[in-house]
């Protein structure tokens, strides 16, 4: 996917069901399991996005896995759900949805977009560098996209962190915000959203 992220698709022996926001447990070593967000809609295949910069057992497994390898996994787990409002029109849906992700935190949102996007959905992503941006490398149809790049300015992006963008543009109190990413960043983003009077649901990794 890029030098820091592996995009892994696993074929299941039979169709499985899960909700956007849930995760799978993957055996990455004989006695070690790691949780990874499910990045695809339910079905016969499972998509995982794995950050390999950590150099841990999960990163080593993701770096070494090859086509045809057998993988032990269990799913689904988790109670953090990203509502898809399936069968609901934009007019009927109670709240606008704004998704915010850093790095592989985009994974559960990809599952949500596969299950059903709405015309008023917004996806805000944050990266240090443009080469870390995953949105141009996924085949999942995305909603309106806002990219925040904190280092060098780039055309078509907001120059700064996601927190800078939210402070500059303001919070929509009529929206529901879904936030996923590293704990510190998610905490800072959630505080801004809550201070703006909006609903926020978040998950960290």
Report each predicted region and the residues it spans.
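FNR/FR-type flavoprotein reductase catalytic core
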Residues: 57-205
């Amino acid at each position: 996917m890029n030098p820091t992220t592996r995009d892994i698709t696993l074929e299941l022996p039979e169709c499985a069901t899960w909700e956007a926001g849930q995760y799978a447990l993957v055996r990455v070593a004989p006695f070690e399991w790691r949780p990874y967000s499910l990045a695809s809609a339910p079905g016969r295949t499972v998509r995982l996005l794995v950050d390999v910069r950590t150099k841990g057992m999960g990163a080593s497994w993701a770096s070494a896995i090859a086509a045809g390898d057998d993988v032990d996994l269990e799913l689904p787990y988790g109670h953090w759900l990203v509502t898809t409002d399936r069968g609901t029109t934009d007019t009927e849906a109670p709240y606008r949805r704004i998704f915010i992700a850093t790095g592989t935190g985009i994974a559960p949102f990809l599952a949500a977009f596969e299950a059903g996007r709405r015309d008023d959905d917004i996806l805000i992503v944050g990266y240090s560098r443009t080469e870390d941006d995953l949105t141009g490398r996924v085949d999942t149809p995305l909603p309106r996209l806002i990219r925040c790049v904190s280092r060098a300015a780039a055309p078509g992006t907001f120059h700064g962190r996601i927190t800078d963008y939210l402070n500059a543009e303001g919070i929509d109190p009529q929206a529901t915000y879904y936030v996923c990413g590293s704990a510190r960043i998610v905490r800072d983003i959630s505080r801004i959203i809550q201070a703006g009077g909006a609903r926020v649901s978040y998950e960290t990794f």
